[in-house]
Design a protein with these regions (language model features):
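Core catalytic lobe of class I
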Residues: 1-182, 186-191
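Short, conserved SAM-binding/catalytic segment
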Residues: 194-198
Length: 198
Protein backbone atom coordinates (compact mmCIF):
# COMPACT_ATOMS: atom_id res chain seq x y z
CA UNK A 1 0.00 0.00 0.00
CA UNK A 2 2.94 2.36 0.53
CA UNK A 3 2.96 5.42 2.75
CA UNK A 4 4.25 6.22 6.21
CA UNK A 5 1.04 6.84 8.15
CA UNK A 6 -1.64 4.26 8.93
CA UNK A 7 -4.44 6.81 9.26
CA UNK A 8 -4.62 10.41 8.11
CA UNK A 9 -7.39 12.15 10.04
CA UNK A 10 -7.65 15.86 9.42
CA UNK A 11 -9.94 18.87 9.29
CA UNK A 12 -8.75 21.06 6.44
CA UNK A 13 -9.10 24.85 6.52
CA UNK A 14 -12.50 26.07 5.38
CA UNK A 15 -11.04 29.49 4.62
CA UNK A 16 -9.58 30.30 1.24
CA UNK A 17 -8.68 27.32 -0.91
CA UNK A 18 -6.99 27.46 -4.28
CA UNK A 19 -9.18 25.20 -6.40
CA UNK A 20 -8.27 23.38 -9.62
CA UNK A 21 -10.03 26.10 -11.63
CA UNK A 22 -7.04 28.30 -10.66
CA UNK A 23 -9.47 30.65 -8.93
CA UNK A 24 -9.45 31.70 -5.33
CA UNK A 25 -12.75 30.93 -3.60
CA UNK A 26 -13.65 32.48 -0.29
CA UNK A 27 -15.58 29.78 1.58
CA UNK A 28 -16.44 32.22 4.32
CA UNK A 29 -16.74 30.09 7.47
CA UNK A 30 -16.54 32.40 10.44
CA UNK A 31 -13.65 31.81 12.83
CA UNK A 32 -12.25 29.05 10.61
CA UNK A 33 -8.60 28.76 9.68
CA UNK A 34 -7.60 31.13 6.93
CA UNK A 35 -4.97 29.49 4.79
CA UNK A 36 -4.52 29.33 1.06
CA UNK A 37 -3.36 25.99 -0.26
CA UNK A 38 -3.78 23.99 -3.43
CA UNK A 39 -6.37 21.31 -2.67
CA UNK A 40 -5.31 18.96 -5.50
CA UNK A 41 -1.66 19.05 -4.45
CA UNK A 42 -2.72 18.43 -0.85
CA UNK A 43 -4.85 15.41 -1.82
CA UNK A 44 -2.08 13.89 -3.95
CA UNK A 45 0.44 14.22 -1.14
CA UNK A 46 -1.91 12.86 1.53
CA UNK A 47 -2.71 9.87 -0.69
CA UNK A 48 1.00 9.24 -1.19
CA UNK A 49 1.98 9.33 2.50
CA UNK A 50 -0.96 7.30 3.87
CA UNK A 51 -0.79 3.50 4.09
CA UNK A 52 -4.39 2.68 4.87
CA UNK A 53 -7.17 5.20 5.49
CA UNK A 54 -7.78 8.91 4.93
CA UNK A 55 -10.55 10.91 6.62
CA UNK A 56 -10.88 14.58 5.69
CA UNK A 57 -13.43 16.86 7.35
CA UNK A 58 -14.25 19.61 4.88
CA UNK A 59 -16.69 22.32 3.91
CA UNK A 60 -19.55 21.53 1.54
CA UNK A 61 -17.79 23.59 -1.13
CA UNK A 62 -14.73 21.29 -0.95
CA UNK A 63 -16.66 18.04 -0.70
CA UNK A 64 -17.21 17.41 -4.41
CA UNK A 65 -13.57 17.98 -5.38
CA UNK A 66 -12.27 15.72 -2.61
CA UNK A 67 -14.86 13.02 -3.31
CA UNK A 68 -14.07 13.16 -7.04
CA UNK A 69 -10.34 12.74 -6.36
CA UNK A 70 -10.93 9.57 -4.34
CA UNK A 71 -13.68 8.29 -6.67
CA UNK A 72 -11.05 8.22 -9.43
CA UNK A 73 -8.86 6.05 -7.18
CA UNK A 74 -11.86 3.80 -6.48
CA UNK A 75 -12.54 3.37 -10.23
CA UNK A 76 -8.96 2.11 -10.60
CA UNK A 77 -9.54 -0.49 -7.86
CA UNK A 78 -7.27 1.26 -5.35
CA UNK A 79 -9.81 1.59 -2.55
CA UNK A 80 -13.28 2.64 -1.45
CA UNK A 81 -14.66 6.14 -0.92
CA UNK A 82 -17.61 7.21 1.23
CA UNK A 83 -19.13 10.44 2.50
CA UNK A 84 -19.33 10.58 6.28
CA UNK A 85 -21.74 12.89 8.08
CA UNK A 86 -21.46 14.17 11.63
CA UNK A 87 -25.04 14.93 12.69
CA UNK A 88 -24.80 17.35 15.58
CA UNK A 89 -27.30 16.63 18.34
CA UNK A 90 -27.02 20.23 19.56
CA UNK A 91 -26.28 22.49 16.56
CA UNK A 92 -25.28 26.05 17.34
CA UNK A 93 -28.13 28.56 16.93
CA UNK A 94 -25.64 31.20 15.72
CA UNK A 95 -27.33 33.25 12.97
CA UNK A 96 -30.14 30.69 12.85
CA UNK A 97 -33.08 32.82 13.95
CA UNK A 98 -34.48 33.21 10.42
CA UNK A 99 -32.86 30.27 8.59
CA UNK A 100 -32.39 26.51 9.00
CA UNK A 101 -29.62 25.58 11.43
CA UNK A 102 -26.63 23.83 9.95
CA UNK A 103 -26.68 20.61 11.95
CA UNK A 104 -24.13 18.54 10.02
CA UNK A 105 -20.47 18.46 9.06
CA UNK A 106 -19.11 16.44 6.16
CA UNK A 107 -16.05 14.27 5.82
CA UNK A 108 -14.69 12.16 2.99
CA UNK A 109 -13.45 8.69 3.97
CA UNK A 110 -11.14 6.69 1.72
CA UNK A 111 -9.77 3.26 2.61
CA UNK A 112 -7.01 1.89 0.44
CA UNK A 113 -7.40 -1.68 -0.74
CA UNK A 114 -6.44 -3.98 2.13
CA UNK A 115 -6.57 -1.13 4.65
CA UNK A 116 -7.73 -1.35 8.26
CA UNK A 117 -11.43 -1.24 9.11
CA UNK A 118 -12.37 -2.57 12.55
CA UNK A 119 -16.13 -1.98 12.29
CA UNK A 120 -18.80 -4.14 10.66
CA UNK A 121 -21.74 -2.88 8.55
CA UNK A 122 -21.47 0.56 10.12
CA UNK A 123 -23.56 3.56 9.10
CA UNK A 124 -21.87 6.63 7.60
CA UNK A 125 -23.84 9.00 9.86
CA UNK A 126 -22.39 9.72 13.31
CA UNK A 127 -24.48 11.49 15.98
CA UNK A 128 -22.60 13.45 18.62
CA UNK A 129 -23.03 16.83 20.30
CA UNK A 130 -20.80 19.80 19.54
CA UNK A 131 -18.06 20.37 22.06
CA UNK A 132 -18.53 23.49 24.16
CA UNK A 133 -15.07 23.80 25.75
CA UNK A 134 -13.05 23.89 22.56
CA UNK A 135 -9.49 25.21 22.30
CA UNK A 136 -9.93 25.79 18.56
CA UNK A 137 -13.04 27.14 16.76
CA UNK A 138 -13.43 24.04 14.57
CA UNK A 139 -12.44 21.35 17.10
CA UNK A 140 -14.44 18.14 16.69
CA UNK A 141 -16.19 16.13 19.40
CA UNK A 142 -13.59 13.87 21.02
CA UNK A 143 -15.92 10.84 21.16
CA UNK A 144 -16.53 11.18 17.42
CA UNK A 145 -12.76 11.27 16.85
CA UNK A 146 -12.32 8.28 19.18
CA UNK A 147 -14.84 6.23 17.18
CA UNK A 148 -13.15 7.11 13.88
CA UNK A 149 -9.68 6.31 15.23
CA UNK A 150 -10.80 2.95 16.68
CA UNK A 151 -12.63 2.00 13.48
CA UNK A 152 -9.76 2.88 11.15
CA UNK A 153 -6.51 2.08 13.00
CA UNK A 154 -4.99 -0.28 15.54
CA UNK A 155 -3.01 0.30 18.72
CA UNK A 156 0.56 1.25 17.86
CA UNK A 157 -0.41 2.65 14.44
CA UNK A 158 0.56 6.17 13.38
CA UNK A 159 -2.23 8.75 13.08
CA UNK A 160 -1.29 11.82 11.02
CA UNK A 161 -3.00 15.21 11.11
CA UNK A 162 -1.46 17.71 8.65
CA UNK A 163 -3.86 20.49 9.79
CA UNK A 164 -3.46 19.90 13.51
CA UNK A 165 -5.03 23.02 15.00
CA UNK A 166 -5.00 22.67 18.78
CA UNK A 167 -4.12 18.96 18.62
CA UNK A 168 -7.48 17.28 19.36
CA UNK A 169 -6.96 14.46 16.83
CA UNK A 170 -3.46 13.80 18.23
CA UNK A 171 -4.74 13.91 21.82
CA UNK A 172 -7.43 11.30 21.15
CA UNK A 173 -4.94 9.17 19.19
CA UNK A 174 -2.61 9.26 22.21
CA UNK A 175 -5.48 8.29 24.55
CA UNK A 176 -6.23 5.34 22.24
CA UNK A 177 -2.60 4.11 22.33
CA UNK A 178 -1.79 5.25 18.81
CA UNK A 179 1.32 7.14 17.82
CA UNK A 180 0.62 10.50 16.24
CA UNK A 181 2.19 13.25 14.16
CA UNK A 182 0.56 16.65 13.87
CA UNK A 183 1.53 19.66 11.77
CA UNK A 184 0.30 23.18 12.51
CA UNK A 185 1.38 26.44 10.86
CA UNK A 186 -0.20 28.88 13.32
CA UNK A 187 2.08 29.31 16.32
CA UNK A 188 -0.84 30.10 18.68
CA UNK A 189 -2.43 26.68 18.06
CA UNK A 190 0.91 24.87 17.89
CA UNK A 191 1.64 26.04 21.46
CA UNK A 192 -1.81 24.89 22.65
CA UNK A 193 -1.33 21.49 21.01
CA UNK A 194 2.16 21.08 22.45
CA UNK A 195 0.93 21.87 25.96
CA UNK A 196 -2.11 19.56 25.87
CA UNK A 197 -0.05 16.65 24.49
CA UNK A 198 2.65 16.78 27.20
Amino acid sequence: MGGQFDLTLTDIPYGEVNRSSNGLRNLDKEDADILTFNLQDFLKKIYEVTKSTIIIFCGKEQMSEIHKFFSEKQKKGKGTVRQLVWKKTNPSPMNGQNIYLSGIENAVWFKKRGGTFNAHCKNTVFEYPCGRNKLHPTEKNHELLRELIRDNSNEGDIVFDPCCGSGAHCLVAKEENRNYIGVELKNQYYEIAKERLQ
